Regions:
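Hydrophobic alpha-helical
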Residues: 67, 74-93, 159, 173
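An alpha-beta-alpha
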Residues: 14-18, 33, 126-174
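Structural motif
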Residues: 45-71, 174
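Flexible loop/hinge segments that line or gate small-molecule binding clefts
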Residues: 82-121, 132, 139
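Signal peptide-proximal N-terminal region
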Residues: 34-49, 164-170
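N-terminal helix-turn-helix DNA-binding module of bacterial transcription factors
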Residues: 1-10
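Extracytoplasmic "Venus flytrap"
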Residues: 13-32, 48-58, 80-82, 147-153
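Periplasmic-binding protein-like
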Residues: 16, 71-79, 98-102, 141-142, ...
């Protein structure tokens, strides 16, 4: 495959959409992408990375459309939880574009695959640990960066569900 890519007049382009870089996790992803890009560029593979500046669906939709206009063969998306995003990505998939999603599993997208962890289970684990180290009745503040990312919603749901199960009498502050 490598030789075929090198001799091809049409290099394969892959688009990657990341959320803003204020998250250390995203910075690690970017570092890995840049390393892979250097490694595979000799084989005619072009990686186009676009970093969002907000967590607004309109911005992500614009980036998706920009990558389509650049004739990418496939896309890796850290998807926002928004019906317009679902619709656009599913349209691309229906038109034979390979799409994977990562970090935020979104039920409305029919991706090729998902790469990431079980955020619901992570939230349950955090609540279980909190229950072991804090006395009953503790007031808990929960901070999430955006309701537009299903990973944050899933983690919060797991956290709340586990606290309800253990009947810890914790109070989650708004």
């Amino acid at each position: 495959i490598g030789k075929a890519l090198v001799h091809s007049n049409n290099p394969i382009k892959i688009g990657i959409i990341l959320t803003p870089d204020y998250n250390p996790f995203v910075l690690e992803l970017l570092e890995g992408i840049q390393t892979a890009q250097k490694e595979f560029s000799a084989f005619g593979l072009e990686v186009i990375t676009k970093m969002m500046t907000t967590l607004e669906p309109a911005e992500q939709l614009s980036i998706i459309n920009e990558l389509v206009d650049m004739n990418v063969s496939g896309m890796a998306v850290f998807p926002l939880d928004d019906p317009q995003i679902f619709s656009r990505v599913n349209h691309l998939i229906e038109n034979q574009m390979a799409v994977i999603t990562f970090n935020s599993r979104v039920e409305g997208i029919h991706h090729l695959s998902f790469i990431g962890q079980d955020h619901y289970k992570g939230g349950r684990t955090a609540a279980g640990l909190l229950n072991k180290i804090c006395p009953p009745g503790t007031q808990v503040g929960v901070i999430i960066s955006s309701r537009n990312l299903s990973c944050h919603q899933d983690r919060l749901s797991g956290f709340q569900d586990k606290l309800a199960e253990v009947d810890s009498n914790f109070k989650i502050l708004d």
